[in-house]
Regions:
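N-terminal signal peptide c-region/cleavage motif recognized by signal peptidases
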Residues: 18-20
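Hydrophobic alpha-helical membrane context
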Residues: 15-16, 44
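Bacterial N-terminal signal peptides that target proteins for export
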Residues: 1-8
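Hydrophobic helical h-region of N-terminal Sec-dependent signal peptides
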Residues: 9-13
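Amphipathic, charged alpha-helical segments and their helix-to-coil junctions
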Residues: 22-223
Length: 223
């Protein structure tokens, strides 16, 4: 998990097509709240603690997902590991399988709930300081405009502010609680941020797997 989190800022530089803030400052910056929050030390520590606290639930989730995958494999007639339209229709026509999958999905959702709530709570605490971190970076770099990745079509001179914002977050909120209070309900923006962070983690994990697999797939030379 820590490796995935640390890979996120590298992904950000590629996605933005921007240079680090230390390289130049021209008044235009680019950053993304989810990437900055995901790269903060507080979230890395919180995710690690949450993973330890809910290790039993994570193990149960792996088992439940394995049971669900086994049900679907019954209908994977071509053995490609994917469910095409015909195979999906065959599975949906089997009432017993549908009932079993619905029961598994409900159990998976219930098991995931406390883990997700703890992660969202950690993210929300950091997000509360994100605005302050941005303001400090803006003042330090004389930035007049900050763009999000989704709003950038082309910006040759854009400055990536992500690393500086992460550094400010590390100072403003070095640690957060990884346990949500009883009855706590997250803000809608926090749920959205959580979903974005999870997608970033998935992308970082996929990229890491591809990089690790690349040497093994490289052709043998000199023979």
């Amino acid at each position: 998990m820590r490796t995935h989190l640390l890979s996120i800022t590298a992904l950000a530089l590629t996605a933005f097509g921007a240079v680090p803030a230390a390289a130049q400052v021209n008044g235009v910056g680019v950053t993304d709240p989810a990437i900055a929050i995901a790269g903060s030390q507080a979230l890395q520590a919180a995710y690690t603690q949450i993973g330890t606290t809910y290790q039993a639930q994570r193990t149960q989730l792996e088992q439940l997902q394995g049971q669900r995958d086994a049900l679907l494999r019954q209908f994977d007639t071509d053995g490609d590991g994917q469910m095409n339209e015909a195979e999906q229709q065959a599975a949906q026509a089997n009432a017993t399988v549908i009932q079993q999958m619905q029961a598994l999905d409900q159990t998976i959702q219930q098991t995931q709930a406390p883990i997700q709530l703890a992660r969202i709570y950690a993210i929300e605490q950091i997000a509360m300081q994100y605005g302050n971190a941005v303001q400090q970076v803006v003042a330090a770099n004389n930035v007049s405009l900050i763009l999000s990745p989704g709003s950038v079509v082309y910006a040759a001179d854009a400055v990536d502010l992500t690393d500086e914002i992460i550094a400010r977050l590390n100072t403003l909120v070095p640690t957060v609680s990884a346990s949500a209070p009883a009855g706590w309900q997250p803000q809608r923006q926090s749920v959205t941020l959580f979903q974005e962070v999870q997608q970033l983690l998935l992308s970082a994990a996929v990229q890491q797997q591809q990089q690790q697999a690349a040497p093994a797939q490289a052709p043998v030379q000199g023979r």
